[in-house]
């Protein structure tokens, strides 16, 4: 028995009951019979004190063992309001739990043994109670006869979580209550339940980014809610969510929290599915390099195979167009880019006129001279109009030929004034129109998706429209104001558009992160320093839907020094690989996450992402051996002395030997794939900074008093009211 206790010994018979019973008998016996057996009062008190201490020690051991055995079946949930979430300026609360050690792996190993399950398995009558509850519920309140009414009363009592009596100031827990519908196996958290405490993660570790894996409906959103609420409350930087599917509940949670903290004026909502409520955002309006505009659009095009040729042409094409627009003082938008691609000839003429008016003082005279009709006699002596030769501009409008003639002649005289972007447009204009159309065939559909209907009003907005009171989203504004944002992309309605818009968000942020890394967030302001950096906390739900381009990879690789902290949420490793189409590329993405959270997952391959990181552990067991032998003697000796050895003398009657030793039953990762795949809902393993393994469980979160989350209609109404107030 003592050896078994040294190996934990929490799954065994209740030996302590005998000790407690013996002490319970001896205490009154000594108290009553002590004087009759010669014990003084002092010795009676000493013996009673010793027995009480012994009984108390054994009772404490018994309570610990029984509590552990009951927790292997179910652990009571814990509840928190959003305003009760604990956090500090340097720590992020990630749940309640404990450091997962070798002893926990040993307890899991033991609890799965069939011969030890009877010590914690619920009694057979509990199953009968559950069957009775089902039978009663099927009657739908119609109980006939005394038996059925008795069954209904029993079902009512057995299904209660706790029992309350009017004369008692406390409730009595129902230890045989129905198990919560969380699935999985409760024993994984029970192994360290007595060590459970609030678990915190240093904010510095968040710069290494984090990823959470978990099946649908196992609690990822609950964890996300607990994290984003802390980021909003802390207010030390940006707090934002990218949500491809647009979860109104999550939007409502963030909106309610912003209102509770008085930060609704700094809350920005971008909703592809609800343009009339959305903030306006032009992802190609803020850039430090001209090529950024073209890159943010062309990167949405496929670059695989022959597609790279079209992508490269589109990039060069849009560099010329964006340069022309900026030179003419026009803001590039998706609308203007599409319009000028479709009317390249018009842009060529406008840009040419703009350049000539700026550099050529004789432009008006030259233009009027070339545009004025001229006549000459043909071979028949007839007067015919003398026009410029079309040359490479064949098929173009005559005004285009004039622009080409004037600019060509001017730049021949003034080669130092040649505009390379205009020359790029000229080269495109001289190309076969059908050839150009083929090269832009994949670009036009993309821009059409981004500029159709009400969608164009929010991603290609008219900033000169003073009647439009919707807020404007920009990374500069959100970072400076330490704002809160929710980006819902409605991918279920239009996945292609959602991907394109999401990628432009990330491309814009990558450029901004590069600027912050070089100049800080206060670039251009008096006293600005490169050390002026604030946290940019991004929570990316359905992460696999946001990584269709290289922008997210760049963000993960290089943005940590700019304050960007990404927490990604996804279901499986295969989702990421399928989206990227390349396992090696997926490994590059996953290699950027220094913090790994693993809830219940659907397959072994995903679970191995964590189990291959953690250390291995030896799980032990007691190896008991016994042997009996006779010494060859027909009759036993009449006596033994201290020199006799019945096992070795050869003349003993018989000999016995019992040996107990500890053996290694298995050498395996401290957590197994099976463990991860059978976690209950709301529980997870976390590997913080790739060196600290903790077992976590998450709360049932409730709205803070006075800041309840409304339904969709309430949220939409309040967002409309906010826009109306701005007018």
Predicted regions and their residues:
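Accessory regions of macromolecular translocation/handling assemblies
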Residues: 1-241, 248-264, 327, 374-377, ...
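Short, solvent-exposed helix-helix connector turns and helix-capping sites enriched
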Residues: 39-42, 343, 603
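Short acidic-hydrophobic sequence patches enriched in Asp/Glu that either
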Residues: 47, 69-74, 246, 551, ...
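Short, surface-exposed, charged/polar-biased interaction segments
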Residues: 130, 137, 233, 339-343, ...
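P-loop NTPase motor domains
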Residues: 190-195, 203-218, 222-564, 676-680, ...
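A broadly conserved detector of short glycine/acidic/proline-rich loop/turn motifs that flank catalytic sites
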Residues: 205, 491, 602-603, 614, ...
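Short conserved micro-motifs at the rims of enzyme active sites and ligand-binding pockets
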Residues: 280-281, 497-499, 551, 579, ...
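Conserved ATP-driven motor cores of ASCE-family P-loop NTPases powering translocation/secretion/packaging/pilus
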Residues: 556-558, 562-688
């Amino acid at each position: 028995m003592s050896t078994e206790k040294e190996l934990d010994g929490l799954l065994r018979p209740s030996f302590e009951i005998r000790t407690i019973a013996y002490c319970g008998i001896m205490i009154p016996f000594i108290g009553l019979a002590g004087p009759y057996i010669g014990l003084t009062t002092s010795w009676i008190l000493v013996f009673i004190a010793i027995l009480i201490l012994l009984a108390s020690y054994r009772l404490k051991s018994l309570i610990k063992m029984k509590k552990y055995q009951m927790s292997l079946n179910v652990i009571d949930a814990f509840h928190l309001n959003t305003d009760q979430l604990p956090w500090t300026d340097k720590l992020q609360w990630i749940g309640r739990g404990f450091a997962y050690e070798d002893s926990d792996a040993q307890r899991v190993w033991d609890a799965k043994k069939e011969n030890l399950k009877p010590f914690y398995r619920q009694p057979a009558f509990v199953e009968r109670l559950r069957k009775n509850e089902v039978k009663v519920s099927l009657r739908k309140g119609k109980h006939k006869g005394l038996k059925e009414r008795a069954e209904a009363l029993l079902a009512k009592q057995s299904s209660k979580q706790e029992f309350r009596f009017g004369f008692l100031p406390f409730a009595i827990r129902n230890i045989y209550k129905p198990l919560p519908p969380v699935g999985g196996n409760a024993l994984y958290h029970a192994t360290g339940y007595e060590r459970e405490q609030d678990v915190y993660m240093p904010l510095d570790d968040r710069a290494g980014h984090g990823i959470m894996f978990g099946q649908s409906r196992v609690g990822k959103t609950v964890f996300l809610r607990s994290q984003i609420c802390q980021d909003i409350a802390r207010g030390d930087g940006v707090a934002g969510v990218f949500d491809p599917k647009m979860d109104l509940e999550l939007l409502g949670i963030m909106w309610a929290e912003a209102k509770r903290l008085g930060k609704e004026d700094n809350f920005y909502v971008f909703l592809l599915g609800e343009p009339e409520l959305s903030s306006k955002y032009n992802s190609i309006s803020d850039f430090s390099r001209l090529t950024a505009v073209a890159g943010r659009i062309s990167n949405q095009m496929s670059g695989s195979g022959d597609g790279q040729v079209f992508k490269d042409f589109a990039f060069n094409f849009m560099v010329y167009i964006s340069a022309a627009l900026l030179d003419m003082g026009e803001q590039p938008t998706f609308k203007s880019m599409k319009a000028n691609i479709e009317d390249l000839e018009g842009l060529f003429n406008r840009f040419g006129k703009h350049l000539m008016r700026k550099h050529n003082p004789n432009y008006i005279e030259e233009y009027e001279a070339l545009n004025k009709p001229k006549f000459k006699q043909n071979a028949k002596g007839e007067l015919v109009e003398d026009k410029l030769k079309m040359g490479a501009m064949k098929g173009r409008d005559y005004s285009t030929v004039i622009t080409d003639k004037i600019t060509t002649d001017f730049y021949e005289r003034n080669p130092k004034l040649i505009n390379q972007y205009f020359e790029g447009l000229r080269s495109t204009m001289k190309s076969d129109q059908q050839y150009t159309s083929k090269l832009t065939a994949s670009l036009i559909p993309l821009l059409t998706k981004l500029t159709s209907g009400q969608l164009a009003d929010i991603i290609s907005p008219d900033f000169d429209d003073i009647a439009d009171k919707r807020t404007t989203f920009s990374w500069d504004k959100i970072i400076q104001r330490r704002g809160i944002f929710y980006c819902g992309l409605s991918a279920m309605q239009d996945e292609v558009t959602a991907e394109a818009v999401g990628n432009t968000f990330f491309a814009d942020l990558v450029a901004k992160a590069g600027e912050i890394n070089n100049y800080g967030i206060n670039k251009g302001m008096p006293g600005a320093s490169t050390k002026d950096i604030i946290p940019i906390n991004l929570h990316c739900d359905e992460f696999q839907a946001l990584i269709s381009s290289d922008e997210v990879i760049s963000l993960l690789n290089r943005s940590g020094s700019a304050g960007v902290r990404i927490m990604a949420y996804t279901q499986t490793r295969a989702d990421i690989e399928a989206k990227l189409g390349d396992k090696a590329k997926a490994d590059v993405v996953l290699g950027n996450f220094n913090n790994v959270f693993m809830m219940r997952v659907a397959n072994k391959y995903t679970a191995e992402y964590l189990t291959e990181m953690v250390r291995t552990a030896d799980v032990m067991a007691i190896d008991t051996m016994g042997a009996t032998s006779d010494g060859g003697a027909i009759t036993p000796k009449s006596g033994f002395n201290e020199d006799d050895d019945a096992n070795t003398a050869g003349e003993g009657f018989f000999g016995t030997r019992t040996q107990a030793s500890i053996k290694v039953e298995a050498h395996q990762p401290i957590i197994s794939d099976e463990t991860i795949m059978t976690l209950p809902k709301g529980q997870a393993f976390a590997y913080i900074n790739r060196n600290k393994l903790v077992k976590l469980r998450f709360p049932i979160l409730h709205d803070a008093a006075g800041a309840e989350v409304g339904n969709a209609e309430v949220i939409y109404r309040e967002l409309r009211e906010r826009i109306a107030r701005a007018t």
